[in-house]
UniProtKB/Swiss-Prot annotation:
Family to which the UniProt record says this protein belongs: Belongs to the universal ribosomal protein uS5 family.
NCBIfam families: rpsE_bact
Gene name as annotated: rpsE
Protein name: Small ribosomal subunit protein uS5
Alphabetic keyword roster: Ribonucleoprotein, Ribosomal protein, RNA-binding, rRNA-binding
Keyword Methyltransferase tagged: no
Length: 172
């Protein structure tokens, strides 16, 4: 089974969402009469202000697979609380054999992240972050692990509500 890694393609549509294609894989189904070829596309969509979604699409042709993936990513968007263009706090994410460490960074640091993680932060609008991946480097698992970590973010307001205190008490 051949595998094609497509370059990360970016594109901004009229609705203001940023789209990036992370990978396109050629997949094969073996049946009695031979092989059936198809394509699987992995994409992320974001608004540049903390909203992010991931989609995976499969089809017989590449453009259809990418379109399906983009539509699924738009449907699966969720909001991540950002703080001045970076994350709220350090967080770990995991999916399958992939694990990621996401940490906030000072202004001017930039996005220090590899491959699929960089695409996620670019469409999300994060300007300063340090990210490290451990384990499997499968693009699908890395994106899912990154999104898992981002979902675990807590704002000072969330923490204050859990503890029954005010935000000023939490921040010191």
């Amino acid at each position: 089974m051949a595998k094609m890694q497509a370059k990360v393609q970016a594109d901004e549509r009229d609705d203001g969402l940023r789209e990036k294609m992370i990978s396109v894989n050629r997949v094969t189904k073996v049946v009695k009469g031979g092989r059936i070829l198809g394509f699987a596309a992995l994409t992320v969509v974001g608004d540049g202000d903390g909203r992010i979604g991931m989609g995976k699409g499969k089809a017989k042709e590449v453009p259809v697979a990418v379109q399906k993936a983009m539509e699924q990513a738009r449907r699966n968007m969720f909001k991540v609380p950002l703080k001045n263009g970076t994350l709220q706090h350090e967080v770990h994410g995991k999916h399958g054999a992939s694990a990621v460490l996401l940490a906030p960074a000072k202004d001017g640091t930039g996005v220090i992240a590899g491959g699929p993680m960089r695409a996620v932060f670019d469409v999300m609008g994060v300007q300063n972050v340090v990210a490290k991946s451990h384990g499997s480097t499968n693009p699908y698992n890395l994106v899912r692990a990154t999104l898992d970590g981002l979902r675990k973010q807590s704002t000072p307001g969330d923490i204050a509500a859990k503890r029954g205190k005010s935000v000023e008490d939490i921040l010191g």
